[in-house]
Amino acid sequence: EICHKHGAKLLVDEAHGAHFPFSDSFPDEALNCGADAAVLSLHKTLPSLTQTALLITNDSELSEIIAENLAVFETSSPSYILMSSIEKCLDFCENSKDKFKEYCCNLKTVREKLKNLKYLKIYDKSDTDFDYDIGKIVISTANANISGTKLAEILRNNYQIETEMAYPDYVIAMTSVCDTEKAFDMLSGALISIDSELSKGADTERVPLKNLYTGKNFNACELYKFNKETIPFQNSEFRTSAEYIWAYPPGIPLIVPGEI
């Protein structure tokens, strides 16, 4: 409403929401909430090759403007492999209602199995005032004697489960419609087993990440002319950073190159 009040178009980064239209169990899609256009990364949550994405709009005038500008910025040598993957993905979505129904059933089952974890915690809609995508299983380690990064490491090395990302206080397990009931059983079994070996308390190896910025020595573009070295994070106080410090790209960095 604010955008439209001022004559602006609203473009939503809905990269992780390409699966939203296919079940009422997921949040409402951006275009249904008033957005003029949205970007959907098919490869993140649907069966499509990496790099495949869609730019969708419900505004015919905006569609014409986008088409004109795409002619300027798009490559003249598109990948027909990627475009074919997009078409295959869309065909799958149109003809796989039962798959999405089964997927949502598996998501609810795994959450039911994990609701009684003693030290780890699975976030759900009751933990936020915002809508929540149940396809992303957020595992909090805030009240356990283990960090999120360590939990992700154990899941990878001991259970062959690769998580989407790990942070000091949580892990995100990204799921998709292509995950099987067996895969969800593996995840729940692994977390129940790990939880049984934990105790209450904060992990002593966690590094506080708040208020790291203390000043700026150089612009990032000036750093190429200086020598650089790799040192432990604990020894970096008052040193100039030569790279970004962030939990994941393209997230907001805590420190950028040139800062102290």
PLM features: what roles do these ranges have?
Residues 115-259:
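Conserved C-terminal alpha-helix-loop-beta "cap" of PLP-dependent enzymes
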Residues 97-100, 104, 181-184, 260:
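Generic detection of long, well-ordered alpha-helical segments
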Residues 1-123:
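Conserved PLP-enzyme active-site core in the AAT-like
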